[in-house]
């Protein structure tokens, strides 16, 4: 029989890693950190690290629960807007190594990523671009700090299936004691193409989340449900110049 040429695609088609991400269907999101111990959702950036002192934390128990519920991965808030880091970074004192947890020798990013490997589910990280603790937020120096943090997370914890960049950017914060409000241009300040290049080089299988993609995006609400017939359009104009 005569061969028939496949028609050209008339709509955008997903990359292979986006297809794999969709196949996961459900995964857990762990919003945990210094705020957990200070009754805050969005920390101001001024909470004392000494208040972070979980005494019965068991990341393996977390992952076992996720596995039993049918989830295929987990994403962790490695750093939320308050700027506190759940890994022992050398880039700031505002991190887990200056807490009572395991006498400053803990690393929850490591503990959770290792538990994921042990029980066979995927691991991902959330890294807030906005940082209400750092005195230099809003300057070019902070952007370099942000990229060094991103490099640490991409280089030291094995494979990650997603990198989550939150859309909340700029506003009031502690900022090294200045206690003021700072405004940035979210489309240009972080130079996101640089982030995408770094991720493609260090974690090529990872899907990138932001308000507008390029891998996947915010569903549009925080109720846990997408609207009916959600085509997951990537609203690039909200994030990129």
Task: Please report, for each region that a protein language model flagged, where it lies by residue.
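Mature catalytic domains of secreted/periplasmic carbohydrate-active enzymes
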Residues: 1-241
């Amino acid at each position: 029989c005569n061969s028939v040429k496949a028609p050209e695609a008339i709509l955008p088609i997903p990359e292979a890693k986006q297809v794999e991400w969709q196949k996961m269907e459900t995964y857990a999101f762990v919003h945990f950190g210094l705020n957990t111990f200070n009754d805050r959702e969005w920390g101001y950036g001024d909470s004392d690290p000494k208040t972070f002192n979980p005494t019965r934390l068991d990341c393996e128990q977390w992952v076992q629960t996720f596995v039993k519920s049918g989830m295929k991965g987990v994403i962790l808030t490695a750093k939320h807007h308050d700027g506190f880091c759940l890994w022992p970074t050398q880039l700031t004192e505002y991190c887990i190594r200056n807490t009572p947890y395991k006498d400053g020798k803990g690393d929850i990013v490591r503990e959770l990523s290792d538990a994921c490997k042990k029980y066979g589910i995927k691991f991902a990280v959330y890294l807030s671009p906005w940082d209400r603790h750092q005195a230099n937020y809003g300057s070019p120096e902070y952007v370099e700090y942000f990229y060094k943090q991103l490099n640490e997370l991409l280089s030291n914890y094995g494979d990650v299936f997603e990198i989550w960049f939150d859309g909340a950017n700029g506003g009031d914060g502690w900022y090294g004691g200045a206690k003021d409000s700072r405004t940035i241009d979210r489309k240009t300040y972080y130079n996101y193409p640089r982030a995408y290049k770094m991720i493609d080089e260090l974690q090529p299988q990872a899907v990138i989340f932001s308000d507008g993609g390029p891998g996947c995006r915010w569903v549009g609400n925080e109720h846990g449900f997408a609207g009916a017939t959600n085509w997951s359009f990537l609203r690039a104009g909200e994030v990129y110049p």
